C-alpha cells in the first residue's frame, strides 16, 4: 500500500491525470507486494552471507509467509498439526525458538522448494502486472528506471 500511495502521489504531484496516477498506484502496489514476497523467499531460501542478515526469522517469529502458506496447503494432516503447534506457541516460549537443526527437523517432509517456487511465480506475476500498468505511457528515462526496478526486485539477492 505504501509503494502504491507514494507512486500515485508522485504522479499526481508531477501533474499526471487521474487515470495515469491510478496506473502508477497499481505499479507501486504490485511492486511493493512483489518486494515483500521476494523478502519472504530470501528469509527461507537465501544465502545468509549474501542477504546480510539471519535467515529463518519469519519462521521463528511465527509469521506465516507465502512460501509457508503454500507448504501448509500441500501438507498432510500430520504435518499441518506439527506446523500449527509451532505457530501457535507463545511467542516468548522456548517452543518457538528453534535452532537450525530443530527447524530442519520440523520442516522435514515439507516441500519447501515448492513453496519457494510458488512464491517466486507470484512475485513474477505481480511484477508483470506492475510493468503492464505502465504500458502505453510515453517512454522516458524515469519510466525506464521504474521498469528496471521491477526486474531488480525479482532477481535481488539481499
Question: Which residues are covered by each model-predicted region?
Answer:
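All-alpha prenyltransferase/terpene-synthase fold signal
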Residues: 1-158
Amino acid at each position: 500500500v505504501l509503494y502504491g500511495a507514494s507512486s500515485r502521489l508522485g504522479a499526481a504531484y508531477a501533474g499526471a491525470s487521474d487515470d495515469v496516477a491510478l496506473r502508477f498506484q497499481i505499479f507501486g502496489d504490485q511492486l511493493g507486494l512483489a518486494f515483500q514476497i521476494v523478502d519472504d523467499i530470501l528469509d527461507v531460501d537465501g544465502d545468509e552471507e549474501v542477504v546480510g542478515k539471519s535467515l529463518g526469522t519469519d519462521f521463528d517469529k511465527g509469521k506465516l509467509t507465502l512460501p509457508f502458506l503454500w507448504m501448509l496447503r500441500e501438507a498432510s494432516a500430520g504435518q499441518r498439526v506439527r506446523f500449527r503447534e509451532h505457530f501457535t506457541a507463545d511467542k516468548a516460549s522456548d517452543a518457538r525458538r528453534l535452532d537450525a537443526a530443530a527447524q530442519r527437523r520440523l520442516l522435514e517432509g515439507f516441500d519447501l522448494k515448492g513453496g519457494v517456487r510458488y512464491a517466486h511465480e507470484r512475485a513474477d506475476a505481480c511484477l508483470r502486472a506492475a510493468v503492464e500498468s505502465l504500458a502505453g505511457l510515453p517512454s522516458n528515462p524515469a519510466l525506464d528506471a521504474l521498469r528496471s526496478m521491477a526486474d531488480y526486485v525479482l532477481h535481488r539477492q539481499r
